C-alpha cells in the first residue's frame, strides 16, 4: 500500500464517518443526458414537470421544449428514476422514441414513419425488424396454362 493507497484509505474512513467498509465501494454515477417525451398542454404543465424533475437528486439541468413535447434532463440521476418522477406528476411520459433522420442508415421501414414525430426525426426502430420489406413469394401459374382448356380458371371472355 503506497502513498496513494494510504490517502485513499484515510479519505474513506473520514468520508464514511469511521465505518469500516474495506471491500465495499460506492459506484459513482456517470453524468448522462436523459430525453423524455412528456405530454404538456400549458405553461402550468411545463412548470410542474420542471419543478418536479429539478428536485430529483443528482439532476443538474432541466430543459423543456414545449413545441416538441421534449424534456432533456442532464445530471447524475438514473434514467428510470427520472422517468418515474415524470410519470408521478400525472403526465404521460416515455423515453424519447425518436432519432434524427440523418442518423438512421435506412429509414425506409414502415414503422419508422410516424405522423406525430417532430420535423427531422423518425421513430427508433430495431434494424432487425423487416416487417413489410420482405417480398411474399407464391407460385404464379405459368403463362402457358392461363389460356389452357384444361384450366377451369382460365380466360373466360367468351
Swiss-Prot record:
Keywords: Lipoprotein, Metal-binding, Methylation, Prenylation
Lipidation (S-farnesyl cysteine): 155
InterPro entries: HMA_dom, HMA_dom_sf
This protein's record includes keyword Membrane: no
Propeptide positions: 156-158
CDD domains per record: HMA (cd00371)
GO function terms (MF aspect): metal ion binding
PTM-bearing positions, type Cysteine methyl ester: 155
Gene3D superfamilies, per database record: 3.30.70.100
Binding positions for a metal cation per the UniProt entry: 42, 45
Pfam annotation, one family: HMA
Highest taxon above the source species: Eukaryota
Residue ranges of every copy of the HMA domain listed in the record: 31-94
Family per similarity comment: Belongs to the HIPP family.
Function noted in UniProt: Heavy-metal-binding protein.
Subunit organization: Interacts with ZHD11/HB29.
Protein name per the record: Heavy metal-associated isoprenylated plant protein 23
Organism per entry: Arabidopsis thaliana (Mouse-ear cress)
Gene (UniProt): HIPP23
